[in-house]
């Protein structure tokens, strides 16, 4: 896990992603979602979460409002949707597709496999710089921007700092301890909520990773009972 995250981080650096850059993530819940989020986190970059079900109008608003320079999409269907409105997102420079087999002749688009290859190729040269970024992150630095659903108007961005996430994790551990529960490397946690929500990222993903537990990813919220049996 650590090796993959650091390779992705070095690949991100190779295409110009820097600390404090805002990077959109618009993808279904998956292990890759977690890995790219952690890579951005370790770089000191800021993830901007976007539900993959949003329309191009709503997505364009979020990307323009946050001034995202980069966008990570989960598949080609989402990519096609974004490309139809690309001209209306002036800050967007490059799109990363979370597909190992994706190849593009468009300089604006890059597949995950190419990110990994760049990370492996440049890791020796980039690693010291990566460590300096990771180790200089402060509590008050932004970790993520989470947008509201927009049910009462256009979505609004909520900034969460690294301290906010650490505090959420501490709260989760304290809650479990209060009721005589714990989590360790012997446990498996089931992730079924969209990772665009902060609750699952902080209270499930990061707590599980910190504790060495395995994370299983549900096919969808509707299949949760079958996934638990598996």
Question: Which residues fall in each region the model found?
Answer:
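Conserved S/T- and glycine-rich ATP-binding loop of Class I adenylate-forming
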Residues: 23, 40, 71, 142, ...
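Conserved AMP-binding/adenylate-forming core of the ANL superfamily
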Residues: 1-38, 55-60, 111-119, 160
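Conserved AMP-binding/adenylation subdomain of ANL enzymes
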Residues: 166-191, 195-230
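Conserved pre-ATP/AMP-binding loop-to-beta segment of ANL
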Residues: 97, 117-147, 154, 180-188
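A short helix-loop-beta submotif of the ANL/AMP-binding
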Residues: 10, 22, 28-56, 64-70, ...
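Short acidic loop-to-helix transition motifs that present clustered carboxylates
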Residues: 32, 54-57, 78, 174, ...
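Structural core segment of the AMP-binding/adenylate-forming
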Residues: 15, 42-118
């Amino acid at each position: 896990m650590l090796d993959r995250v650091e390779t992705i981080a070095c690949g991100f650096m190779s295409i110009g992603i820097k600390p404090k850059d805002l990077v959109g993530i618009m993808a279904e819940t998956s292990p890759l979602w977690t890995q790219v989020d952690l890579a951005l986190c370790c770089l000191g970059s800021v993830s901007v979460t976007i539900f993959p079900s949003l329309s191009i109008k709503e997505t364009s608003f979020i990307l323009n409002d946050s001034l995202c320079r980069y966008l990570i999409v989960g598949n080609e269907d989402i990519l096609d949707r974004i490309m139809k409105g690309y001209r209306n997102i002036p800050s967007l420079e490059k799109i990363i597709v979370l597909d190992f087999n994706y190849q593009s002749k468009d300089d604006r688009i890059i597949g995950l496999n190419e990110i990994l290859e760049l990370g492996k190729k440049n890791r020796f040269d980039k690693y010291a710089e990566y460590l300096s970024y990771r180790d200089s992150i402060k509590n008050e630095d932004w970790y993520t921007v989470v947008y509201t659903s927009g049910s009462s108007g256009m979505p609004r961005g909520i900034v969460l700092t690294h301290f906010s996430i650490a505090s959420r994790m501490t709260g989760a551990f304290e809650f479990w301890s209060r009721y005589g529960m714990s989590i360790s490397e012997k446990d498996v946690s089931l992730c079924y909520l969209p990772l665009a929500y902060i609750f699952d990222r902080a209270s499930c993903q990061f707590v599980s990773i910190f504790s060495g537990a395995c994370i299983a990813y549900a096919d969808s919220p509707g299949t949760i009972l079958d996934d638990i049996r598996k």
